[in-house]
Design a protein with these regions (language model features):
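Conserved acidic donor-binding segment of nucleotide-sugar-dependent glycosyltransferases
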Residues: 301-303, 307-314, 322-329, 343
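Aromatic "clamp/platform" in nucleotide-sugar-dependent glycosyltransferases that forms part
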Residues: 250, 269
């Protein structure tokens, strides 16, 4: 089967790029499909994640004013589809333009993959004008979402967000599942994500300032793209926790960092899914997470393989971290269960669902 993915880019260090590298590579290498990916303005850029050598990349150059940009986008997509004649198309574009593709391309089975929550469109402290504009855009997306053969989301929360008749839930697959697991003996708590309001590291740092008062020999390590505007470095100094917090840029092999950690802290205010949660669990690391939309409640079985804390309850989040920090036996028990429970996200389980969906539509 010939499968075409349409996305903005695959060269970044984000969750969508990581997930696409796993899915597309598994479809090509293990299931034997012919996989193509079309990206925008990425020619010559180096890849952060590894993609199968069997995958064929196609580049569409789009630039200029909005009218010129859209025209180049439409023409580029039509030309590639006409040349490749794929059996099925999957659109991984969280912007508005991708929603119009069923109306603009030849009649080929087409799927939309939604990788983010609707909440992300509103941003931080939106003005009334922005709220109205985003609300109208989401209404348009809801209408256009019905034009796809399938609209695939990641969590049950997303189903409630969209309420579409053609909706289906397929979670993200794991990008790794090490044979070994963390010893959970290092006095390190890990967090992973970009320095944005969404990721809630300001909340985590406030909790950490309380924790180190009684556990000064523990360290918090945060991996992710830094942004001085978010004020994280300043907050670390303000809270006087410089000796207990280390901040790193993204690393391709995050598994080694999970394996050297004992607890994973997930402080997001809202999410699309929470890839790093299942990655930590794959390394046998117990997680403490806010019960934010969307993802954590689908992933964590609270009090079994980690802790789910009411969103915004910093005191409870702090207490749950302390429970794991101060109880090696509890860490071992939850970490072992996490590694078992997370197997439902293995590629052979998740990508099989995609394979079945593609085959059902391409009949």
């Amino acid at each position: 089967m010939k499968i075409l993915y349409i996305t903005n880019g695959i060269h970044g260090a984000g969750g969508l790029e990581r997930v696409l590298s796993v899915k597309a590579s598994y479809l090509a290498d293990v299931l034997g499909h012919e996989v193509h990916i079309v990206v925008l303005n990425n020619k010559g850029a180096s890849l952060f994640y590894e993609f199968s050598a069997k995958i064929q990349l196609h580049h569409v150059v789009v630039n200029g004013n909005p009218i010129s940009y859209i025209w180049q986008y439409i023409k580029g997509m039509r030309d590639i589809v006409a040349t490749l004649k794929p059996d099925v198309i999957s659109v991984c574009d969280d912007g508005l333009k991708g929603f119009f593709l069923p109306l603009l391309l030849p009649k080929i089975p087409i799927i939309y993959e939604r990788h983010v929550s609707k909440q992300m469109a509103f941003g931080v402290h939106p003005s009334l004008l922005k709220k109205l504009r985003v609300a109208l855009q989401l209404q348009l997306m809801n209408w256009l979402g019905r034009t796809f053969d399938k609209f695939v989301v990641l969590t049950q929360d997303n189903v409630q967000e969209w309420k579409l008749p053609n909706i289906q839930v397929i979670a993200n697959p794991l990008s790794f599942y090490p044979e070994n697991q963390s010893s959970l003996t290092n006095k390190t708590v890990i967090a992973v994500g970009k320095h944005t309001y969404q990721k809630g590291f300001d909340r985590l740092l406030q909790c950490w300032a309380t924790i180190v008062k009684t556990n000064p020999d523990w360290s918090l390590e945060i991996y992710g793209k830094a942004d001085e505007k978010q004020g994280m470095f300043q907050l670390v100094k303000q809270l006087q926790i410089e000796n207990n917090v280390r901040i790193f840029e993204p690393v391709p092999d995050i598994a080694t960092r999970f394996l050297a950690s004992s607890v994973f802290a997930f402080s997001s205010r809202f999410e699309g899914f929470g890839m790093v949660l299942i990655e930590a669990m794959a390394c046998g690391v117990p997680c403490v997470s806010f019960d934010c939309p969307c993802g954590p409640k689908d992933i964590i079985r609270s009090d079994e393989d980690g802790f789910l804390v009411p969103n915004h309850d910093l005191d409870d989040f702090t207490q749950k971290l302390l429970q794991l920090i101060e109880n090696q036996e509890l860490r071992n028990k939850m970490g072992a269960q996490a590694k078992i429970n997370v197997q439902r996200y293995l590629p052979e389980v998740v990508v099989k669902q995609w394979d079945e969906l593609f085959k059902s539509l391409a009949k």
